[in-house]
């Protein structure tokens, strides 16, 4: 009974005390602002800090051996394999590799011509159900080198071939200088065919539309387009006459040129224009440029180090400008990710080039940087940059020929139909891969040896 009375007295004493406004050993959390924005800002700062720290931490993934070109190439082979894996350039390309001329009764194979160059519409097999398409610029004189010229995503191959008045026809300049040139059509930044018309169309660019379908499958538009370039190299490698091979690109094409030359040692020299810079703010760029885990091991300088000891020319052009997703009609679903591409600054380009030069010091040719006076931008495919590319290929003979005579256009390929085929083929490839994934997973697990005492089927 006395215990019961004691408890009542203790409870009454507790009720008499004012309630505590915080737990012992703590202080009250007070702020004039909302806590959610504070939390987001803190996460933002933490991630920015981690991104900056990745640059120094990348060294743990690399074991470069500059003793000789062969030793260096062997020492970076694991890094090359990892880059190829994370961009999804892993699917077997179709064989035999053949460049096909495309034409018909109402579509001449020869689409344009100058005194020194013929231009043809072509295609080539890449994967099951996926083709590359574009233009072949064939010199009438003896061919001295072969080059894949990659436009920006919003440029047409016809522009680089001089078939569109007022455009920068740098691929034609290479062809006029004795190079066989193939200009592939890339996925562009329109949203015309992004979606399923039976369900809904979206405001996602074609690049984002394919990125979203491929990402969960371990694939990527970058990997698809790198493989498109490599399929051209396969076709050239099958020819009896062996010639130097180069890859050049501007904007999104510069990105593909950099990655393709880093992954495929058959590329003897590469030119990257309007793309190369520090990548620690990649999160600001369009989502279709994002590769899972990329910055942990690779910035542009590290990817450039995979090109060594071969020639790499960086051209400081302004690069494309993208303000965000495309404007579309109101009936479309709005779900495109934000992201911008801003013109490059010389300081950012030079800083990354210097980093690349440090990484490959003593190995082959240093990374070349072409710019205007005092770091001014140059037009993509400037004469000094193209000349440096040809020198890297070891091409003898005259310099880049000036001026260009505009070609006589016989027929203009249907660029819209070509782009629609590109989007549809890659979309179907991803969907087919998705349908086959379950059996692939089952095969993977069946090949796994269970540990003693573990019931995998349970």
Label the model's feature ranges:
Residues 2-12:
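Bacterial N-terminal signal peptides
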Residues 17-132, 142, 212-225, 230-234, ...:
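Alpha/beta-hydrolase-fold serine-hydrolase catalytic core, especially in secreted/extracellular enzymes
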Residues 136-140:
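Short, low-complexity Ser/Thr-rich regulatory SLiMs
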Residues 142-244, 250, 275-289:
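Cap/lid segment of the alpha/beta-hydrolase catalytic domain
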Residues 174, 260-261:
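Aromatic pocket-lining residues of Rossmann-like dinucleotide-binding sites
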Residues 240, 264-265:
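Active-site catalytic pocket residues across diverse enzymes, especially alpha/beta-hydrolases
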Residues 248-257:
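Gly/Ala-rich beta-loop-alpha elbow adjacent to hydrolase catalytic centers
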């Amino acid at each position: 009974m006395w215990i019961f009375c004691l408890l009542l007295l203790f409870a009454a004493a507790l009720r008499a005390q004012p309630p505590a406004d915080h737990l012992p050993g703590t202080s009250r959390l007070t702020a004039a602002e909302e806590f959610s924005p504070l939390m987001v800002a803190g996460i933002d700062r933490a991630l920015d800090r981690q991104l900056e720290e990745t640059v120094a931490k990348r060294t743990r993934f690399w074991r470069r051996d500059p003793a000789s070109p062969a030793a260096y190439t062997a020492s970076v082979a694991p890094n090359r394999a990892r880059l190829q894996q994370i961009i999804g350039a892993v699917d077997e390309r179709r064989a035999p590799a053949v460049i096909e001329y495309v034409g018909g009764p109402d579509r001449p194979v020869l689409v344009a011509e100058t005194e020194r160059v013929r231009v043809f519409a072509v295609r080539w097999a890449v994967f099951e159900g996926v083709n590359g398409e574009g233009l072949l610029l064939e010199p009438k004189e003896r061919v001295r080198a072969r080059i894949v010229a990659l436009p920006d995503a919003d440029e047409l191959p016809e522009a680089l071939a001089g078939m569109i008045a007022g455009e920068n026809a740098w691929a034609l300049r290479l062809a006029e200088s004795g190079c066989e040139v193939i200009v592939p059509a890339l996925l562009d930044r329109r949203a015309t065919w992004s979606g399923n018309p039976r369900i809904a169309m979206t405001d996602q660019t074609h690049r984002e539309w394919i990125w979203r379908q491929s990402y969960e499958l371990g694939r990527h538009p970058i990997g698809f387009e790198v493989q498109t370039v490599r399929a051209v190299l396969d076709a050239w490698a099958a020819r009896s006459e062996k010639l130097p091979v180069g890859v050049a690109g501007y904007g999104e094409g510069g990105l593909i040129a950099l990655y393709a030359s880093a992954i495929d040692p058959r590329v003897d020299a590469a030119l990257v224009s309007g793309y190369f810079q520090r990548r620690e703010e990649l999160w600001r760029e369009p989502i279709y440029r994002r590769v899972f885990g990329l910055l942990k091991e690779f910035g542009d300088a590290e990817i450039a180090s995979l090109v060594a000891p071969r020639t790499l020319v960086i051209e400081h052009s302004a690069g494309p400008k993208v303000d965000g997703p495309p404007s579309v009609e109101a009936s479309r679903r709005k779900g495109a990710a934000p992201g911008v591409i801003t013109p490059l600054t010389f300081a950012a380009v030079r800083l990354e080039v210097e980093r690349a030069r440090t990484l490959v010091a003593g190995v082959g040719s240093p990374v070349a940087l072409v710019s205007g006076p005092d770091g001014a931008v140059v037009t993509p495919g400037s004469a000094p940059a193209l000349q440096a590319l040809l020198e890297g290929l070891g091409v003898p003979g005259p310099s880049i020929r000036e001026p260009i005579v505009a070609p006589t256009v016989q027929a203009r390929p249907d660029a819209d139909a070509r782009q629609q085929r590109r989007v549809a083929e890659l979309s179907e490839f991803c969907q087919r891969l998705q349908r086959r994934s379950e059996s692939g997973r089952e095969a993977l697990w069946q090949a796994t040896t269970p540990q003693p005492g573990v019931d995998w089927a349970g």
